[in-house]
């Protein structure tokens, strides 16, 4: 059984027991969260596709950890003009473990 849900402007395909890295959620570590924006649920041959969301579809997950991703360097450079700017960015994320999928 697997499902596709939407969180943080992105779509994720998950199954029970899987750990997924999402955009930062303001929920403490160890708490549970429910995602109601379920786009599709597949259980063997039975497939439910939402328009746009599946009615009664809920994905339950437990927040495992929060953190920051790898550093991305942004460089602006103009040749022969003695001009160079550097900037770095580290995006916050939340790791969640999928505990249940229901339709």
From Swiss-Prot:
Alphabetized GO MF terms: rRNA binding; structural constituent of ribosome
A single BP term in Gene Ontology: cytoplasmic translation
GO cellular component: cytoplasm; cytosol; cytosolic large ribosomal subunit
Alphabetical keyword list: Ribonucleoprotein, Ribosomal protein, RNA-binding, rRNA-binding
Membrane-spanning parts: none
Record carries keyword Acetylation: no
Pfam families: Ribosomal_L21p
InterPro entries the record matches: bL21-like, bL21-like_sf, Ribosomal_bL21, Ribosomal_bL21_CS
Similarity comment: Belongs to the bacterial ribosomal protein bL21 family.
Role played: This protein binds to 23S rRNA in the presence of protein L20.
NCBIfam families the record matches: L21
Quaternary state and interactors: Part of the 50S ribosomal subunit. Contacts protein L20.
Protein name: Large ribosomal subunit protein bL21
Lineage: Bacteria, Pseudomonadati, Pseudomonadota, Gammaproteobacteria, Enterobacterales
């Amino acid at each position: 059984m697997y499902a596709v849900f939407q969180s943080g402007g992105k779509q994720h395909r998950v199954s029970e027991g899987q750990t997924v890295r999402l955009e930062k959620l303001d929920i403490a570590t160890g708490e549970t969260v429910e995602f109601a924006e379920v786009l599709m649920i597949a259980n063997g041959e039975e497939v439910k596709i939402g328009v746009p969301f599946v009615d009664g579809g809920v994905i339950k997950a437990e927040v495992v950890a929060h953190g920051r991703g790898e550093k991305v360097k942004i460089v602006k450079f103009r040749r022969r003009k003695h001009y160079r700017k550097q900037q770095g960015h580290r995006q916050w994320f939340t790791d969640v473990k999928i505990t249940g999928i229901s339709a």
